[in-house]
């Protein structure tokens, strides 16, 4: 809200506003139902200089799938202002204001739409502002309510919306463009036909008493709007009852004229400024043809094309969002997959190594079996090779003994040296014994008669030695010199 020029008077001393209305009056409203053939429900609304077109699609399958709800339908409300709707060209596409209005308008309809009857579906409401003149959000809500009813969406009741504001210190109903620009406050409200408020906003400063006064005006204005909405819907969906009788054609025509509902409730008189111009009385049929030829054809094709383009753009945006979401999900999945791949590669490497070792062992065993089979075959063909096997076994034993000796070499070297010394001593003793034996043999040959005497002497010596052995104490035994035993044996011989 900007500063008001000094020479601008919004309310006169008589209580009239710039457009000739009183403080508690709404602007004239005109509603057309079913203006879009491709939409499930549609409405064209003119409220003052506001021109709103609404199309409703659904219930239909919700895309993307992740936006579905298992217990109810998803309500999607899209408010958009055409670039030619204001004096300064509006930037096409969604803005912060349009997003905010879409959100609050959707929340205004959620309490009355029976979304639980259509789970996993979507109800799309597309609002296109063709010409803006203050109060576009309230006008869009009124038109959307009619379009939902035209689409056959189950609702607990119609939604009506109106706004009040503060202008020159006075509370007025349904602000126009100048009052909205230079007024002190703006207070839009939406409510059900039972008086339950579903939307309430405020821009500016108001006291509690002013709010109470304004809400009373809003209730009055919403009641008038509800009557217009009901009259328009009744006019479309009610069919005149034709009585079958033998009446004349003029009388039947008169009955039809009586049965047709009056459109006065749907089309309110125009503003005083426009009423000053001379009016030409025309019939209702001509008026309907004029409206169909001037208003609807001028906008229907263009608006349908614009709505289709916007739908395509919104679908493309949704597809791009889905792709981005899928890419993010794939990236998130790729990180653990990389770790898993590394772990799998390590596990596979270990398994491959084990498999290679097993294969090598199997190949070695197969080669050994083949060699054994070849040897067995050769043995069957040539029994002489059995000796070769025995020789191989002996050689293996000798190899094993050699390996054992090599392991014991450091310890056995000393033992071998000692054994060699003992062998040398034994050889010396053996040589000396041989010499003694030779000498004894010569002596025996020379003195055979003396043998008996020596035997007797030896027996006596043995008898003397035996008691000595018995006298030996302890566990130790007396070992005799083998050299003596040899000499004694030789003597015995």
From Swiss-Prot:
It comes from the Archaea. GO terms for biological process: gene expression; rRNA catabolic process. Residues 249-259, 383-400, 472-493 have a biased composition (Basic and acidic residues). One of its GO terms (cellular component) is cytoplasmic exosome (RNase complex). It is found in: Cytoplasm. Residues 244-264, 291-493 are annotated as: Disordered. Keywords: Cytoplasm, Exonuclease, Exosome, Hydrolase, Nuclease. InterPro entries: ExoRNase_PH_dom1 (IPR001247), ExoRNase_PH_dom2 (IPR015847), ExoRNase_PH_dom2_sf (IPR036345), PNPase/RNase_PH_dom_sf (IPR027408), Ribosomal_Su5_D2-typ_SF (IPR020568), RNase_PH (IPR050080), Rrp41 (IPR011807). PANTHER family: EXOSOME COMPLEX COMPONENT (PTHR11953), EXOSOME COMPLEX COMPONENT RRP41 (PTHR11953:SF0). NCBIfam families: ECX1. Catalytic component of the exosome, which is a complex involved in RNA degradation. Has 3'->5' exoribonuclease activity. Can also synthesize heteromeric RNA-tails. Belongs to the RNase PH family. Rrp41 subfamily. This is Exosome complex component Rrp41. The lineage of its organism: Archaea, Methanobacteriati, Methanobacteriota, Stenosarchaea group, Methanomicrobia.
